[in-house]
Amino acid sequence: MSNLKKILSLLLALGLIAAFMTACNKQTTGTEKVTEEAAQTAESGETAKVEDVTVYNKQENPETVIMVVSFGTSFNDSRVKTIGGIESAIAKAFPNYEVRRAFTSQIIIDKLAERDNVDIDNVTEALDRAVADGVKNLVVQPTHLMNGYEYTDLKEELEKYSDQFDSIKLGEPLLTSDSDYEAVIKAITEDMKDYDDGETAIAFMGHGTEADSNGVYAKLQEKITAAGYKNYVIGTVEAEPSIDDVIAFAKAGSYKRVVLHPLMVVAGDHANNDMAGDEDDSWKSLLEKEGFEVVPVLEGLGQNEAIQQIYVQHVSALL
């Protein structure tokens, strides 16, 4: 009888242990699932439902249309705040004109259509739509940072439609004239002033390009330094200056902290991964490895109201 009690007690104990292990496993699995879902929704923006507007100030049979052309991004929250912010500012400034959206990246267009059921025209589709709608005058404002390959491709595409409209006018990229540089410097330094404590390097990450237009980064660096912001540094993710230059700058200035901000219209893949990601080769990781405190700011230039107004001024010059 005593042996039977021992066996029953042992079985009961084993049962309790098994139940405990199962519960722990379920809890761990649940946590992993939540973490995985959070990672998946970071890009799609499902945590905060967003609404894309692709046509503003909609009119019947508009003679003149403003088309805002962007590369695009699949990061929904950033797209609404940045590209949407620029488009909205233009629409508000010119309420008598219909404003339409077009993207140049077919990969992003296809991804948004498949993942989110969001339909956005590419440039050719937007031009064909304008022709079909009987639009006579087209004002095209790109949100590009510089006059590089993307801008050249857009210009060539518009030339194919020169006989389809009474007029096609193409606006300038963000950084074109000296006054543009001055306005951008004022906008970004005002936006970052709360981080400027004398012990912090403020680094802006641009995309970079093999085109001659890559020189805009050196020019912006020269002008921002000349304006007295000697703790500001410009780098690029795919060209020169590079993260190595940013690290050297931060070391030379004996800075303790580095604030990272995209020098891009949107805070998309480059900002979230190449700049602020946890991978070993991200700017954040490389700077932390060198002993710096790193503060990533995941905000695209397009959500800065002062930057939005520069694009508004470029459109105004065409109307």
What does each model-identified segment do?
Residues N25-L319:
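Active-site-proximal alpha-helix that buttresses catalytic centers in soluble enzyme cores
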Residues L14-A18:
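Alpha-helical transmembrane segments
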Residues A19-A23:
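C-terminal motif of bacterial Sec signal peptides marking the signal peptidase cleavage site
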Residues M1-L11:
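Bacterial N-terminal signal peptides that target proteins for export
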Residues L10-A13, K81:
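Extended amphipathic secondary-structure runs
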